[in-house]
């Protein structure tokens, strides 16, 4: 059930976010003028392209489950700058921050949990390590299992 939840989170987040990146690429000058220059950041056109490609490529990586954590990191980074922009220009306006907060939380959740078993990352991990006793997407479960073994060993003393 958890892996299905991660799949849905990845696919819906990527599918809903990707158009924002394509819209930036369609008119990069307007995006730079409206969002990057007000923050007084250097190289506004370059940073606008970085934001757009982070959203487009990061979204595709989330959707496919390939290099998923890198995609989630790109999305979280770009969205954190968008949150900063929203706060600087409009204060703590919940109507601006709620969608950004959801995108950020989804990216951080995928970053923390990994892609799940329904991902290209998992297929690659299984192909590279055919004798693996546990899923690469379930490394936290493996760590929990190690902790249980240690607790059992201590209790048996």
Which role does the model predict for each range below?
Residues 1-26, 45-53, 57, 64-157:
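Extended, low-polarity transmembrane helix blocks
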Residues 25-43:
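Membrane-interface interhelical connector segments
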């Amino acid at each position: 059930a958890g892996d299905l939840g991660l799949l849905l989170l990845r696919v819906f987040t990527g599918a809903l976010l990707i158009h924002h990146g394509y819209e930036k690429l369609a008119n990069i000058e307007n995006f730079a003028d409206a969002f990057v220059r007000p923050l007084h950041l250097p190289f506004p056109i370059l940073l606008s392209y970085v934001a757009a490609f982070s959203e487009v490529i990061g979204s595709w990586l989330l959707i496919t489950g390939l290099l998923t954590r890198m995609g989630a990191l790109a999305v979280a980074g770009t969205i954190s700058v968008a949150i900063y922009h929203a706060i600087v220009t409009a204060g703590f306006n919940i109507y601006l921050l709620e969608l950004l907060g959801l995108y950020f939380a989804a990216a951080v959740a995928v970053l923390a949990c990994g892609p799940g078993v329904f991902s290209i990352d998992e297929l690659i991990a299984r192909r590279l390590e055919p004798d693996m006793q546990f899923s690469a997407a379930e490394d936290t479960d493996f760590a929990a299992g190690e902790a249980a073994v240690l607790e059992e060993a201590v209790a048996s003393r």
